[in-house]
């Protein structure tokens, strides 16, 4: 079966044989995708004219009602999406929930936020500002929807959440969506869009999806559009310098490689709640989605005198995690999504091993449960130890997108700050400490290079949402998630639909009507 693309209000199969999407446990080919023959320029123009006009004619609360209907539909088909996640991504039930339920929760959050925005079609920002000695001439800022398309080039790890965490604020803002999911796991995103289209929830052109290669997509975006990319730093670099993107000053939001940190405070000794909470969170981040999360912990910073004990504690927990076919009882860690991702993980792991010792795992020949290692895409959870600190290179520059993390001991707070900053900006850091003096120096020292800093102490306990969870009510992002022309990048939060909106200043006479 070949998955069709939804463009110019029609379902169209791409030409040729296309690429196969496989089961990463068995290697079985499931479906095929192709974007060959799709007129991307026509698809984008149809979205701008038909989809954009229809969405902008609706009020915020009307758009919010459509998001609520989408969430209800996705919830009703949750079991079908879990099955696709299992077959195409090798997801355990917990992994599928993280993606699918996360998507549904996010859409619901934006639906609630949009309803609260009321019957307007654009937003006033702040009050009137005097521009003259008297109030006869004033200014007012507005947030206006872009007249173009929100183009999403998404990553393979979250085909559901990755689509809807971007699409929900765009649709709420009145901007049509053009989604290009990552090829290896495109099936789930395509099915969700197909279900929404079949239900007739959105007007024609409000959402489009193309599965397969991006081809000439960036040749046809304009200054009225916004492009959002999640993926590798290498691809991101090519996108930033694409001739059309540069020539037309296209807004582009990039979320690329990120070596996120978990940082243990000097007070978090073995036996303390903070130590135990750190162990639990590190293991969870290494195993949920098999470590295939942009926000996953890649570096573990711990006081030199405690680092070995922390490594032993994490290793002990990892030893109890069953790795194998998610269809088998008790399996906690599934495969990576493809053999290509497995090869990339092994390549990155080889670089890390040049300056690290292996504390746990790292065996390329380990035997997963109920799976053939020769055809499956498993990587054993691996904990490394690097005592080179700032002198190390790969540990701070290479993100192994899998169940791999590196323990890095630090000498004092200043050293911890320097090591965390050596990642050149990350999406998130989590800190496990109740030491006010330590936190007072560390958090301000790393905040400007992190999209989010989560502090966990004994009082917080297990009530926190998690190091790697992205909440629609809270910003995340950072220097590794940049927007051209907008400064430090971030992800939108519910109630903040500004990413697909454009700020405009409007000087006016004091007696002029407010739009």
From Swiss-Prot:
Residues 470-515 are annotated as: Disordered. InterPro entries: Ald_DH/histidinol_DH, Ald_DH_C, Ald_DH_N, Aldehyde_DH_dom. Keywords: Aromatic hydrocarbons catabolism, NADP, Oxidoreductase. GO terms for molecular function: oxidoreductase activity, acting on the aldehyde or oxo group of donors, NAD or NADP as acceptor. Its EC number is 1.2.1.77. Residues 489-515 have a biased composition (Low complexity). It catalyses: (3Z)-6-oxohex-3-enoyl-CoA + NADP(+) + H2O = cis-3,4-dehydroadipyl-CoA + NADPH + 2 H(+). Coiled coil: none annotated. Induction: By benzoate. Residues 479-488 have a biased composition (Basic residues). Catalyzes the NADP-dependent oxidation of 3,4-dehydroadipyl-CoA semialdehyde to form cis-3,4-dehydroadipyl-CoA. This is 3,4-dehydroadipyl-CoA semialdehyde dehydrogenase. It comes from Aromatoleum evansii.
